[in-house]
Every structure is written in C-alpha cells, then in structure tokens.
UniProtKB/Swiss-Prot annotation:
Molecular function, one GO term: transferase activity
Note: Oxalurate could not be used as a standard substance due to its unavailability, and the enzyme reaction was performed in the reverse direction: the synthesis of oxalurate from oxamate and carbamoyl phosphate.
Protein name as annotated: Oxamate carbamoyltransferase subunit AllG
Secreted is among the record's keywords: no
Catalytic activity: oxamate + carbamoyl phosphate = N-carbamoyl-2-oxoglycine + phosphate
Organism listed in the record: Escherichia coli (strain K12)
Function: Component of a carbamoyltransferase involved in the anaerobic nitrogen utilization via the assimilation of allantoin. Catalyzes the conversion of oxalurate (N-carbamoyl-2-oxoglycine) to oxamate and carbamoyl phosphate.
Thermal dependence: Optimum temperature is 30 degrees Celsius.
Amino acid sequence: MFTSVAQANAAVIEQIRRARPHWLDVQPASSLISELNEGKTLLHAGPPMRWQEMTGPMKGACVGACLFEGWAKDEAQALAILEQGEVNFIPCHHVNAVGPMGGITSASMPMLVVENVTDGNRAYCNLNEGIGKVMRFGAYGEDVLTRHRWMRDVLMPVLSAALGRMERGIDLTAMMAQGITMGDEFHQRNIASSALLMRALAPQIARLDHDKQHIAEVMDFLSVTDQFFLNLAMAYCKAAMDAGAMIRAGSIVTAMTRNGNMFGIRVSGLGERWFTAPVNTPQGLFFTGFSQEQANPDMGDSAITETFGIGGAAMIAAPGVTRFVGAGGMEAARAVSEEMAEIYLERNMQLQIPSWDFQGACLGLDIRRVVETGITPLINTGIAHKEAGIGQIGAGTVRAPLACFEQALEALAESMGIG
C-alpha cells in the first residue's frame, strides 16, 4: 500500500488532521462499553496489569469503585474481593476509552461520548471530579462517593439533556483552537476551554425543564471546575489518534499511557501491540506538607494529549503552567516546545499558538526521531501520593522511558524485513 515509512506516516498524520471529534452526550459507562456488564469489571489506565501490580492510588480508586457500585459495604470487604480476584480489569484503551490518573471506571459511572464525525469512531472518558480528594488520585472516603453519586444522578442527566438540544453536540476542534490562544495546553491548564465550554452549555442548561436546584448545582460545579475540559481533551485526542491508527502502517505513536508500574506505547504500523518499560516518577512542586519522597510513580491515560501533540509538547502555549509544574518560566516553556518539535514530524495549524509566533502545535510523534535524538516526550502531570486514600499532592513533569520507543522501532524494522 505504501512504498516508504515516510509515505505511510504522511497518511497517518493526514488521517489525524482530518479527525473532527464532537462531544455528543454523557451516558452510563455500562451502556457504552459492553464489557462492563460482565460481572465485576473495572477499567484502568495504562497497559494491562493485575491488582497485585497496582500502586497505592490505583488500588484506592478500585476500593472506591467497589463501594460506589455496591459490591462491598466497607473498605475491608472491598479489599477482600479485590485480593481474591473477583474483579476483572481491562485497560481503558482496549475499549476505545481513556481515564486520567488511575483511570478506574465502573459500570454506573458517567462517561463522555466523543465522536469523530469524519470517520465515525467514538472515544469515551469518565468525568472530571474537580479538585480536592478525588477517586482518580486514589481517595475513596464518603465525600468522594457522595460526589460520584451526584455526578451520576444529577450532573449526567443535565449534561445529556443540554447536549441533546445541540445539533451534532459541541465541535471540540473549534473550541480547542480558541482555548490554545487563551493559554491552555490541555493537560495541566484547561481553564480557558472550560470557560468556553460553560459559555456554550449555559444557555442550553438554562432552558431545561429540570429541577432548578439541580441546574444550579451543575452550574456551580462547572463554574469552579477549571480542569473539567481535560477529560474532553483526552477523549478528543483518543478519537483522533484512533483515526490515525486506522492506517496500519508507519512509525507514528498512536497511544502513550502509564499505570504506575509500566509505561506503554502503541505505534501505527504495529497495531494494538504494547511496548512497555518501567515508568519514571514525576518531578515538580508539592502542596504544603508533601515531598518528592511521597510521590507515586507516573500513571494515567492523560498522556494521550502529548501523543496528539499538546500537553507538555505545547508548553509554550501555557507559560503560566511552567511555574505550577516546577519547570521555570517563559523561556523554559519555549525551550520545552522547541525540543519536542524535534521528535514530531509536522505542525497542527488548527491549533496555532500565538506565543510561538502562531506556529501550530506539534503533530505526528515519530519513534524514529525519538530513538535517533534520544529526546523522549515530556509529559505534564498531576502527582498522586503513593499511599491509597490521600490523593493529589502536587504537579510536575515526567519523561517517557526511551526503552519503549527502542523496542517499537526494532519490532517495526522486523515487521518490514529490515535486519
């Protein structure tokens, strides 16, 4: 089909560029992902793993999900069914989904429905819980469970009804094109895009024939949840990268993800095969009372943003983030994006960055360039406490391990008969 890797890569990148993901709906995970109806099943972030291999925050999120679903009445009972192997685990990526941090998603949890209207493929992600103690970082107290019940019983139906009033939902490309000019890089900073989203949703929510108290609660939640758009950006990037993966050739990375134990990548020319290596631990700034020694190793599907070419690769779009993640100032942000541009093949002119002289965000992460230069993707990330139940303790950056890319390049060469 293709006469060279370069030709294949051009086709993959064009497929990604053509993708037009729209936010269409919010539905229970069980109605979108059939595997969640098969006994006690949870989705998790990262490449495949077992309960025994999980770190503290992911285990804490599993306990929380067991309590939320009513599989257990308390922490001890939840741990017992998890330890006894009664719960089946599936990577989010295996079912067209992504999840931040632990990525733990159960049947009753609401999920965003994002459809690439160009090709018809869909991607799913759970909803952002806001700040404080949250399940994605491993907390599972009654306050966390109460918030999840509210998201299921109030937030989901209101958002679904509001989106139902909008023809073809919300065009996320158009919204992100605005957001990136307003200082978002879509991983650690989403405040502008979340505000744009609120602007689009508010008139539709106000017109709903719903309980006024519920409408007020939803508006209050959206008004203070600066990272609400993150989960939409993740589903957007998943839908676009899955579109690229339809071209089963070339050396373009179509997924990067971490589970607190292993970092995994997928490559366009190698299908759904994972190439893994041990994760690194994020370095950054910590909330008062916490330190680097308490940081959990890297985890989460949110590196799908860097796979697409935003997040850490677009640090120059959000120089304010560099201080939050402990990476310096404006020149440091520029240096990061200039370095990342060396390992991506093209630019995404749909996402032009004013502070980068209106250059487009990076596009087309190439394993060949990573291995040749030794430059690995820089990922912006939240930092979880390594013990279950505590939650987020800071934010920082982390590098993908080079070994994943080396393994993938060797496998690609072998598949092409290059010895």
